[in-house]
A protein has these predicted regions:
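Walker A/P-loop
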Residues: 425-449, 605, 609-612, 634
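Conserved SF1/SF2 helicase motif Ia
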Residues: 448-476, 483-487, 625-630
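A substrate-engagement module of RecA-like helicase motors
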Residues: 479-568, 574-576
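SF2 helicase catalytic motif II
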Residues: 575-577, 589-623
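Short basic/glycine-enriched coil/helix segment immediately N-terminal to the Walker B
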Residues: 112-113, 422-427, 559-567, 584-601
Length: 635
C-alpha cells in the first residue's frame, strides 16, 4: 500500500489531482492511498513527471507495516519535503555550511565577464578581406587563409590592450570609440613572433580573454605531421611552452606553407572592424562597465593571479561558456535586427544549406556575448536543477545475514563513505575500492557514491568502464543489478572515440593531416561553431523526460547532449568522458565537462589501459576533481 501527498501550488494541483485520482483513492484534499503494483507505481511517477512544473511537489510513501513507512520518491520541488518526505510546519533561517559554495564558484563573476568580453572580440579577425570574400557566394575567391581568423582576432585584441593594466583597458572599453584600434602586429609581414609575442606581456585578466579569443574553436596544437616544420617541442619544455615554443603555426597550421605566402598581405587587409558599429560599441560599453564594478580584481593581491595557468577551473569554464554560446547563436536561423548596425557591412558566416550570407559580424559578436554571459550565470545553478537519484533501498539496506561472509565488506565500506561525506564536500574525495572478482564491487561502488552524497542529499554519478565492449544488453544488465530504471540510469554506447584516443602515433598523425585538410572546408562558410559536439555514432539509451534545467535554453536542441546530462547515473566506456581533457576542437569537451561538473565519477576496472595511457587517465581524474567530482577507482 502507498500514500501520495501533494504539496503543489496553483494550476499544478489540479493537474496532479487528475493523475492521482485515476490510480488511487483520495483520502484528503491533498492525499491519496491505494494498493498498487511496482509497474503501476512507475506509471504514476511517469505521468506526474510529464505534467510537472516548478509548482509541482508530490511524495510517495510505501506503508511497510503498521508502524513504519518509507519514502519511495518525490516528483517536483523537493524543498517542500525533508529527506524522509515529511512536510514542514515551521521554517527556521540558519546558515547551512553544506549548502554554501565556498570553493568552486568563487570566481563566477570572472568566468561571466571573461566569457562575455572575449565573445565581443572572438571573431574580429573575420573582418579581413580574404575571409569576407571567401564566405560571399557571389565571389569565386580563394578558399584558403594563411592565418585563421582567431589569430587575427588575437592580434587585434592585443593591439587594443597595448601596455595598459586590466583596470585601464576595461575603462577604455567602457568608452570605446570607432578608432580605438588603428593597427596591429601582422605576422609574416612585420617580423617574427619573437618580436611581438601576443600573450606574454598582457596583464592577467587580458591574458585570459586573449586566450579565449585564440582557443574558441580549438586549442593550439603543434602540427608535427607537417614536413616543412621543425620537430615538435619536447614534453620537458611544457612549463614554458608559451614563451619558448609558441608560434602562429600552433593555431594556423598552413601559415608557413610556400603556396600561402602570396595571400598573407590580403589576409591582414582589414575591412570595417565591428568598432564602426554603434550597436557593438554600446554592448561593449555596457559589459565593460558592469565588469569594472563587479570584478574586484584590481587589488595588489589579485593582480598577481595568473588566471590562465593557475586558475584552470576559471579558464576552462569561461571557454565552455563562450563555445556553447557561439554554437548556439551560430545555429540561429533568424537574424536579430536590433543588434545590427544599419551601415555595417561585414558578415560572420553563411548558411550551410543555401550558402547565402547569414549573420552580420556585429550582430554575431553581440549575440554570442549576450548568451555567453547568460550561460556563465546559469552554470552554478546547473547541478541543483538536475534530478538526483531517488531514495533506493538497494543502496541503503544492509547485506542480509546469510551473505555477510562474502559481501559484508560492502556495509563497512558504505559506513566509511558516509562518515567522510561532510568532509568530501569541501576537501573532495579520491577512493580506491579493491575486491576480488565476484565480491560485488559493482553494487558496492553505487552504495559508496550514494553514501558520499549523504551530506548534500544529491546522488549523481557516472560509471566509466574500461575499454571492454559495452553493449546495450550489458548496460541493461548493469541497470537491473543496481535496481534502477531507464529514467535513472542512461547508457552511452558506440562512437569512434576509443580508436581515436588510443591509436598509435603513425595513425594519429595521418588522421590529423586528413582533418586539417577537412577543416578548411568547414571554415569556408565561417560556421565551424555549428559542428556537432558529440560523436555522430554515439547512442544514449535514456527513456526519462527531458525536463528543464538551467542550461535548457542552450542544450535543448541537442537531444543526445541532453540525454548524456539528465540521468542521475550514466554508464559508458571511459572514452566517452575522455574528451573533457583530450578533446581539442569543435566543442568535443563540452558534453563530458558538463557531465563531470554535475556528477561524481567511478572508474570501474580500467584494466585495458597500459602505462602509455596513464597520463590520459590522470588528466581525467585531475579534471574531475577540479570540476568538483568525487572519484572512486574500482579494481
Amino acid at each position: 500500500m502507498v500514500t501520495f501527498v501533494a504539496e503543489c501550488e496553483k494550476k499544478s494541483l489540479n493537474r496532479t489531482r487528475r493523475v492521482l485520482d485515476a490510480f488511487a483513492n483520495r483520502i484528503g484534499s491533498r492525499s491519496w492511498q491505494t494498493v498498487i503494483t511496482n509497474e503501476g507505481l512507475h506509471a504514476v511517477k511517469k505521468l506526474l513527471r510529464k505534467t510537472a512544473s516548478k509548482n509541482t511537489a508530490v511524495s510517495c510513501h510505501w506503508i511497510r507495516s503498521r508502524s513504519r513507512s518509507e519514502l519511495v520518491w518525490i516528483v517536483g520541488n523537493r524543498k517542500k519535503f525533508n529527506s524522509e518526505g515529511m512536510v514542514p510546519v515551521n521554517y527556521t533561517d540558519a546558515v547551512m555550511d553544506s549548502f554554501i559554495d565556498k570553493q568552486q564558484w568563487k570566481t563566477a563573476s570572472t568566468i561571466q565577464y571573461a566569457a562575455a568580453i572575449s565573445a565581443l572580440f572572438h571573431d574580429f579577425g573575420k573582418a579581413n578581406e580574404l575571409f569576407q570574400n571567401k564566405i560571399d557566394p557571389s565571389k569565386k575567391a580563394n578558399r584558403f587563409e594563411p592565418y585563421r581568423h582567431e589569430w587575427i582576432s588575437l592580434r587585434l585584441f592585443q593591439s587594443f590592450v597595448g601596455d595598459k593594466t586590466d583596470a585601464q583597458w576595461l575603462d577604455e572599453l567602457s568608452q570605446i570609440s570607432p578608432d580605438s584600434i588603428s593597427d596591429c602586429f601582422q605576422d609574416g609581414v612585420d617580423g617574427n613572433l619573437a618580436d611581438n609575442h601576443p600573450l606574454l606581456n598582457l596583464p592577467p585578466f587580458a591574458k585570459l580573454v586573449a586566450w579565449l579569443v585564440l582557443a574558441h574553436h580549438k586549442l593550439p596544437i603543434y602540427p608535427k605531421w607537417k614536413e616543412n616544420l621543425a620537430p615538435a617541442p619536447s614534453l620537458r619544455e611544457v612549463r614554458g611552452w608559451i614563451g619558448k615554443n609558441f608560434d602562429a603555426v600552433w593555431n594556423s597550421h598552413n601559415c608557413k606553407d610556400q603556396d600561402q605566402q602570396a595571400l598573407i598581405e590580403q589576409n591582414w587587409k582589414l575591412k570595417e572592424l565591428p568598432l564602426a558599429s554603434m550597436q557593438w560599441r554600446s554592448q561593449a560599453c555596457m559589459i565593460a562597465s558592469k565588469a569594472r564594478v563587479k570584478l574586484q580584481l584590481w587589488s595588489q593581491q589579485e593582480q598577481d593571479i595568473d588566471w590562465l595557468n593557475d586558475q584552470l577551473f576559471t579558464a576552462h569554464l569561461s571557454r565552455l561558456s563562450l563555445m556553447l554560446s557561439d554554437h548556439h547563436y551560430s545555429a540561429q536561423q533568424q537574424v536579430t535586427q536590433e543588434w545590427r548596425g544599419p551601415s555595417y557591412s561585414a558578415y560572420a558566416n553563411s548558411d550551410r544549406k543555401s550558402k547565402q550570407l547569414k549573420q552580420k559580424l556585429d550582430e554575431h559578436l553581440i549575440g554570442v556575448s549576450h548568451h555567453a554571459e547568460k550561460i556563465a550565470k546559469a552554470l552554478p545553478k546547473l547541478n541543483g536543477s538536475l534530478q538526483q537519484l531517488e531514495p533506493n533501498r538497494t543502496f541503503t539496506e544492509s547485506v542480509p545475514k546469510e551473505f555477510k561472509d562474502k559481501f559484508g565488506w560492502q556495509d563497512r565500506a558504505t559506513k566509511i563513505a558516509r562518515s567522510v561525506s561532510k568532509e568530501s564536500v569541501e576537501g573532495g574525495f579520491f577512493g580506491v575500492n579493491m575486491a576480488s572478482t565476484g565480491r560485488g564491487k559493482t553494487l558496492a561502488n553505487a552504495k559508496i557514491m550514494a553514501a558520499l552524497a549523504t551530506e548534500t542529499g544529491r546522488a549523481r554519478f557516472s560509471v566509466a568502464l574500461g575499454l571492454r565492449t559495452l553493449t546495450l544488453q550489458t548496460g541493461r544488465e548493469y541497470r537491473e543489478q543496481l535496481n534502477l530504471t531507464d529514467e535513472e540510469l542512461s547508457i552511452a554506447v558506440g562512437g569512434v572515440a576509443v580508436r581515436q584516443l588510443f591509436e598509435n602515433e603513425q595513425n594519429r598523425n595521418r588522421r590529423e593531416r586528413k582533418q586539417s585538410a577537412e577543416e578548411q572546408s568547414n571554415t569556408d562558410r565561417g560556421s565551424e561553431s555549428e559542428d556537432e559536439f558529440l560523436d555522430s555514432e554515439l547512442y544514449v539509451d535514456y527513456k526519462g523526460e527531458r525536463y528543464p534545467h538551467s542550461l535548457s535554453d542552450w542544450t535543448r536542441g541537442n537531444e543526445r547532449l541532453e540525454k548524456l546530462l539528465l540521468a542521475p547515473v550514466l554508464v559508458s566506456t571511459i572514452d566517452h568522458l575522455m574528451p573533457a581533457t583530450e578533446g581539442t576542437k569543435g566543442g568535443k569537451q563540452i558534453g563530458a565537462m558538463l557531465r563531470l561538473l554535475t556528477s561524481d565519477l567511478v572508474l570501474d576496472e580500467p584494466d585495458d589501459f597500459g602505462l602509455k595511457d596513464l597520463p590520459a587517465l590522470c588528466r581525467l581524474v585531475h579534471w574531475s576533481g577540479m570540476l568538483g567530482s568525487r572519484v572512486l577507482l574500482s579494481t
